Amino acid sequence: MNNAQRTMTATYNAAMASPPDICIRGAGIVGRTLALLLARERLRVALVDTPPQTTGPDVRAYSLNGTAQRLLQDLRCWPDSPAVTPVHQMQVFGDHGGILTFGAQDQGTSELNWMVDVPVLEARLAAAVQFQPQIEVVPSPVAAPLTVICEGRASQTRAELGVGFDITAYEQHAIATRLRCERPHGGVARQWFTWGQVPGRSEAQAEILALLPLGGEGGHEVALVWSVHPLRVPHLMGLSAEDFASELGQACHMALGHMTLSAERAVWPLQLARASRWIGDMPGTTKQAFALAGDAAHAMHPLAGQGLNVGLADVAELVRVIQAKEFWRPLHDSKLLRRYERARQADVQAMGLVTDGLQRLFAQPGPVWQNLRNWGMWGFDRSGPLKNWMTRQAMGQDAAA
């Protein structure tokens, strides 16, 4: 056995009472959720948890739909307010007068989705894992019939297994932070498709700016995700907190009044990516298999706010496939795992195409494209059944419901 194979098939950790059925590599939100779901099926789980690489402030907040909320509530891991903020309405502004409004009341409900503080959610999941006797948290990989890789888009295990990761880089980086606003957000998520001047470029470049409500009902705090051209990043990151808030206020037309930064700024490149395959045999054996889930399998533009929803849908589908397996079929069976791969690849590809198409549509310069997309927004906002169908899809509801 060579070194790579030895790494892939790490020996059983004697600290565990009995050999695990499944090893999960990655103890983020997706990995811990999967571990808790599998433990309820009376499966023995080894959860590989390694210290995070960064120690800076965590400004992440995720938009979660109804399906994800019900999943986490069922695990008793749904955070309390103000760590969870219901979104009652979403407003999307085009670059030349177009506007879309999505309202929860139009769907006969009180929330479109929820904004959730990542550190609080991670803490709830970690606490639940500690109280689950079927889960053993381990510092290094453990050999098991099935290994599920939930290490994120930079997964080292995926690379070691030789699984391709097809990446299309956008000419955009995301700048994220949190702000205190003069006016309350009112439970409204706001997004602008706009343009920003880039150093060294004669033409302005497409940008997407989102202000997402935080701090519970009636809160004055928002999460910012500002997708800008990479050449504009040094300028925006180099501004003082006051000057950054001022430039941001101009870009969003002072929608929430005066704003002040309440956290450090973070930045990362945006990309569309997907793994060439989601399942396979571990090296050197046909008795152990792997499956990818979450960002280890895919990445998409954040403009639709579906990243974590898609990752949680991965783990829910994998658990469903395991629940429905024939009693004689082992967890590493390729036909079993192919059911999971087929189900998730199609949905993820569809969502990726939608977000990629929207990003590219609003990145096209010129008055013809500008008029086309803004008239399209106007028409879609009045489309009735089509708009309702799209809204229910984003909410994680059955379109026929």
Regions found by a protein language model. Give the residues of each.
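Conserved N-terminal helical subregion
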Residues: 12, 17-18, 70, 74, ...
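Glycine-rich FAD cofactor-binding loop and adjacent beta-loop-alpha segment at the N-terminus
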Residues: 12, 19-23, 27-88
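Hydrophobic "anchor" residues on beta-strands that sit immediately upstream
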Residues: 22, 45, 145-147, 291
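Conserved FAD-binding catalytic core of PHBH/FMO-like flavoproteins
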Residues: 72, 145-267, 274
